[in-house]
Amino acid sequence: MKTMFLLALLAFTATSAVAQLYTTCSQGYGQCQQQPQPQPQPQPQMNTCAAFLQQCSQTPHVQTQMWQASGCQLVRQQCCQPLAQISEQARCQAVCSVAQIIMRQQQGQSFGQPQQQVPVEIMRMVLQTLPLMCRVNIPQYCTTTPCSTITPAIYSIPMTATCAGGAC
């Protein structure tokens, strides 16, 4: 329970920082240029969602082994609760993160490598399974927009601002 609270607090803090940066820069307080930092490993709850889909999903091509029902229920709760508490835009990015984690695990890639386009089969499975299992709404544009073009949210690369003239 403490872990869930800490994860929720971390997600809230990250969302607030990104929103504050966006608001400050978009209102014209200086000329801000956003620079991506090196790609971090995905947030723990997205790893949990990937594990949940791979281990507990009823989808045969994803399932590696069935966990005990109680184990799946706990992992489902750890995945779905934070997912339900974020914006739809952030959910779309979270779906992309989960799909990328699954793709990298299947291909044996590490998280420091450049991002590749997620195969259609993996993206379709995540888009069909995760919203149903977590009972959350995923925006329609997530089904047609490539992950590489979706605006970064709390589960993606954090952005820092470099402001010209010391203002921002």
From Swiss-Prot:
UniProt-listed InterPro entries: Bifun_inhib/LTP/seed_sf, Bifunc_inhib/LTP/seed_store, Glia_glutenin
Signal peptide: 1-19
Superkingdom as given in the UniProt entry: Eukaryota
CDD domains reported in the protein's UniProt record: AAI_SS
Gene3D superfamilies xrefs: Plant lipid-transfer and hydrophobic proteins (1.10.110.10)
Disulfide bond recorded as keyword: yes
GO molecular function, one term: nutrient reservoir activity
Post-translational events: Contains 7 disulfide bonds.
Short name of any one Pfam family annotated for the protein: Gliadin
Keywords: Disulfide bond, Seed storage protein, Signal, Storage protein
Function: Seed storage protein. Not integrated in the gluten polymer through disulfide bonds, unless incorporated by reduction and reoxidation during dough making. Increases dough strength and bread volume, but decreases dough stability when added into a base wheat flour.
Further remarks about this protein from its record: Encoded by chromosome 7D.
Family: Belongs to the prolamin family.
Listed name of the protein: Avenin-like a1
Gene: AVNLA
